[in-house]
Amino acid sequence: MFDVVISDIEAREILDSRGYPTLCVKVITNTGTFGEACVPSGASTGIKEALELRDKDPKRYQGKGVLQAISNVEKVLMPALQGFSVFDQITADAIMIDADGTPNKEKLGANAILGVSLALAKAAANTLQRPLYRYLGGSFSHVLPCPMMNLINGGMHATNGLQFQEFMIRPISAPSLTEAVRMGAEVFNALKKILQNRQLATGVGDEGGFAPNLASNAEALDLLLTAIETAGFTPREDISLALDCAASSFYNTQDKTYDGKSYADQVGILAELCEHYPIDSIEDGLAEEDFEGWKLLSETLGDRVQLVGDDLFVTNSALIAEGIAQGLANAVLIKPNQIGTLTETAEAIRLATIQGYATILSHRSGETEDTTIADLAVAFNTGQIKTGSLSRSERIAKYNRLMAIEEEMGPEALFQDSNPFSKA
């Protein structure tokens, strides 16, 4: 068993949920076992994320092809890894990082490297005939995460004029992951009927949430409260609200304002929303470059609301350490494709957890049927996950995988929300 090595690595171009190309990578061992992984892609991206390599050939997919990334997998990474143990994830990831040789993986592409990294872990798990979460986390991995369900899409994930990007619900009173999914689905369908009755659009955005034309962020939150109550649940007690402001998308870097408002105004807006609505989590409430704004937000709300850094940290351990030292945020969003390897993803989770920051495993707006992040959330006991709404198969696939894991674990499974400010 211990001489199972990488014999081949294949990559192919597939489409993500937005109809853009991405990679599917297959790592094959000398025993015939293999693992496959598909790489997601973001629309709202942090400026310090690892680079997603695109061909920039206007004759194919408006320049978004990934043939060069595929070539890098097969002609650079495969020869570099061929013959190495399928179980030595850390060494394999280090070899790929060295082969790239750039701080943001711009030479070979984080999409190429991540595809190999995740497929390698799956190949190892399949070789041992273990589920991925158990292979990576061992016997101590038993926490099923509380989902953040994106029911109304705005910002860069829709074309409806809403300033904030995600308006989410968190089923905090659920006794299990399966019940949390049921609660979310019932609120989702209640919201759909409410929108229909008000003659509002029920088309969905990139992450499966509805994207109606609304006048304000508050109107979106009011709709969520109505849907929660219509579905038979009590806001705050059963289901809380969460926001992803994606504030960098409406931040003016020249005059350092948010749609003409100062960072103090932006913090005031968020504080007022938290007074009027059962919000217990806010992601990217300030722009990634606005450290003064983040400091004020953390001082103002950090003792009663989960403040999640996404663009602020981009799953980068160095940036997380810097933010912790400055007292910015109190939670970290974890997106494997922001950093580019499984090893670095695990390091980011470990660092945040040691420092008392909550972690949330997250999808991207451009997703595939790949369910790896569900296993990662359980493997690393993150206690929270963001994987979209209760529609679109690329989102539902992750929920279905989590429910399967919960059933497989039986009484060992523990549904646990890692948000310390949860009202449940």
Swiss-Prot record:
A GO term, aspect molecular function: phosphopyruvate hydratase activity
A GO cellular component annotated for this chain's UniProt record is:
cell surface
Q: Cofactor: bound how, per the entry note?
A: Binds a second Mg(2+) ion via substrate during catalysis.
Locate the residues binding Mg(2+).
Answer: 244, 283, 310
Q: Which InterPro entries match?
A: Enolase, Enolase-like_C_sf, Enolase-like_N, Enolase_C, Enolase_CS, Enolase_N
What is the annotated localization of this protein? Cytoplasm; Secreted; Cell surface
Q: Which reaction does it catalyse?
A: (2R)-2-phosphoglycerate = phosphoenolpyruvate + H2O
Q: What does this protein do?
A: Catalyzes the reversible conversion of 2-phosphoglycerate (2-PG) into phosphoenolpyruvate (PEP). It is essential for the degradation of carbohydrates via glycolysis.
The family database entries (PANTHER family) matched by this protein are listed as: ENOLASE (PTHR11902:SF1)
**HAMAP family assigned to the protein according to its UniProt record, in alphabetical order:** Enolase
Q: What is this protein called?
A: Enolase
Q: Which organism is it from?
A: Chlamydia trachomatis serovar D (strain ATCC VR-885 / DSM 19411 / UW-3/Cx)
